[in-house]
Amino acid sequence: MTQDDQPDYRIPQGGGVPWRDMGMEETHRPPERDIEITAIETMAIAGNFTWGIVKVETDADVYGLGETFRAEAALDMAGRMEVDLEGENPLDTDRIRELLEQRYTGTGRIGQAAFTAIETACYDIKGKLFDVPVYELLGGKYRDEIKI
């Protein structure tokens, strides 16, 4: 591969996330393996403090759930991210992370909290589709029980 064949990675001025054209063909999954995000729903659950739940829905009639803290602001941010994620494949979590990092750099903890809930929901979708617990997707079980 020559230097001219390399993908275009650029560091934004002042640092930040390397830029890559997410429209490049190499960043897409083959159509026969496609599943798409169709909607993102958010809900707040009151308790000692407010928890946020994010539901990522797909065209395969499978949905995933993720949770977040800082519910009001993070849920608002997750709702705004829906526009960027509709049509994306929830199995491509690295691609989704890069896409959201590019578009939402500078949103701080709120942006990270929103993304983490979406990412968790995508892993939940993977677990359901592959019929394995999410901990298996993340490297396996570490322990069988914990002290409470």
Predicted features by range, described:
Residues 43, 137-138:
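A generic local secondary-structure boundary/capping motif
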Residues 35, 116, 144:
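Structured loop/turn residues at beta-strand edges in well-structured enzyme cores
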Residues 22-25, 40, 59-132:
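Metal- or metallocofactor-binding catalytic centers and their adjacent structured scaffolds
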Residues 64, 144-148:
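Hydrophobic faces of well-ordered beta-strands that scaffold small-molecule active sites
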Residues 16-64:
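Structured beta-strand/loop patches that form or line metal/cofactor-binding pockets in enzymes
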Residues 2-22:
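Intrinsic disorder at enzyme termini
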Residues 130, 140-141:
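Subtilisin-like serine protease catalytic core
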